[in-house]
A protein has these predicted regions:
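Loop/turn-to-beta-strand initiation segments
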Residues: 116, 144-145, 176-179, 208-214
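Pre-Walker A (pre-P-loop) alpha-helix and adjacent loop at the N terminus of AAA/AAA+ ATPase modules
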Residues: 70-118
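Short glycine-rich substrate-engagement loop in P-loop NTPases that contacts/grips substrate
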Residues: 84-98, 139-176, 192
Length: 258
């Protein structure tokens, strides 16, 4: 009809004016971050994936912000604190930790939601927290949602929310974030609730295909006594086992600073 032809001509004239002024002809058209929902957050009456991802990112940032630890980097991890003397297995702690360092760095660089689960174990002060924080730092830079917290802080928060002493959706955030890093899983968590929650988190994230990194001071032969057969079976069967060896780096640094 005449009106349609007039509108088309007006649009063409406007585009020509913009082009003659050196401006892109699409300058006046809206530019959306999400072309699926046109930045409305919903499509076909359902929450758009962009909104879900944004909420997930905010939730993980808020939860990780509550940890008292600062993100570390691979650059400030030093192998010089690890002994060069060979142990009974014919490998020195420095050689082993060089391999651990390179593995963790590659893990972070190549991270995807299909990356394997990691169980870092060994005595206290050997760099488990440092390298897990370095992984978190790099994975966050790649745009993935990361939740990092100590086991004690996390299970305390989950318990308060579960029994109504605090509000929040920590459990959903923990279960569905791209990467969960659970630091310092120790022997002090021996209540039925905590043991049940440990299994729920580990098992659920395996089912959802979401990678998890756990660090612990416990030896492998102590796992069943600490966490039960179900948790131990999941860790042994579904996690890459990363042994940390050496002397307590924190104590060495403390002595050197005097």
């Amino acid at each position: 009809c005449i009106r349609d032809r007039t509108n088309l001509q007006l649009q063409k004239d406007r585009e020509n004016l913009l082009l003659s002024a050196g401006v892109d002809k699409n300058y006046l058209k809206p530019h959306y971050t999400c072309e699926i929902c046109k930045d409305k957050g919903y499509t076909d009456g359902k929450i758009c994936s962009c909104r879900t991802e944004l909420l997930k990112k905010f939730a993980s940032e808020e939860l990780s912000y509550k940890t008292p630890l600062k993100l570390s980097s691979f650059e400030d991890f030093s192998l010089s604190y690890y002994p060069t003397e060979k142990y009974g297995n014919g490998i020195s702690p420095r050689e082993r930790m060089k391999g651990v360092y390179e593995f963790c760095r590659e893990y972070a660089a190549d991270f995807s939601t299909e990356s394997p689960n990691l169980f870092m174990y060994g005595e206290t002060g050997l760099g488990k927290t440092h390298l897990s924080l370095a992984i978190a730092n790099e994975v966050i830079k790649k745009g993935f949602s990361v939740v990092y917290d100590s086991a004690q802080n996390l299970f305390t928060r989950l318990e308060k929310e579960r029994f109504g002493r605090e509000g929040g959706n920590t459990e959903d955030t923990v279960l569905y974030c791209d990467l969960l890093i659970l630091d310092d899983l120790g022997a002090e968590f021996d209540t039925k609730y905590v043991l049940s929650e440990i299994y729920n988190i580990i098992n659920s994230r395996i089912s959802y295909g979401r990678p998890t990194v756990i660090s612990s001071n416990a030896a492998l032969d102590e796992l069943t006594g600490l966490y039960g057969a179900r948790v131990t079976s999941r860790i042994i069967g579904d996690y890459e086992l990363i042994l940390f060896e050496g002397r307590d780096v924190r104590q060495i640094k403390k002595r050197l600073s005097k």
